[in-house]
Amino acid sequence: MKICGITREDDALLAVAMGADAVGFVFAPSKRQIAPSIARDIVRRLPPEILTVGVFRDEAPSRVIDIVNTAGLRAAQLHGHESAETSRLIRARVPLVIKAFPAGDPELDRVDDYGADAVLIDSPRPGSGEVFDWSLAEGRPDGRRVILAGGLTPGNVADAIRQVGPWGVDVASGVESDRGEPGQKDARRVKAFVEAARGALPPRAPRPVDDLDGFGPYDWMEDDAR
């Protein structure tokens, strides 16, 4: 499961401590937008097994590639109207690509063209935090790693997992504090979300990121030696 919209180091460490598999940093214009330099500093504090994801929306491929690699991220999440050609170009230059689509998007029928490692299905208004009809995500795209997003909370994530059976789930606003700065996470909500999601998994289910072992984290020692 991915805790997205991380803006503070404390929240990233909180997510990891509570059992999250991944954390996301938003580089697209948003109230949760973070500077690449700050994201890089946070990433360097995280365990290497954590999947670190940069979220972009219709950004120039060269900038996506530069931020992912210089910040030491393991994945680029393309959350806009990126073409299949753009997705493949970026995938050739970063460790992993997650391509996001609105629920019901006909492009889900040709998702193989995008060359993405995982597909994220969001509400028809991506990033709005709105819940959508989960039946739109059932069984599609077949045989792909599907990440479910859109209005998930500690109160509904278990039902979503049982109905859709996704490879992963993604949350941002559903675990945020009612007070504080934009993007600030609430420890109790993060804990409740992770516990609810884990509780909905079948016994002995592997952690979703376990099948990404071939895609290692950024090698900081190699980078520093250049």
Give the label of every model feature segment.
Residues M1-R226:
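Conserved N-terminal beta1-alpha1 strand-loop-helix module at the mouth
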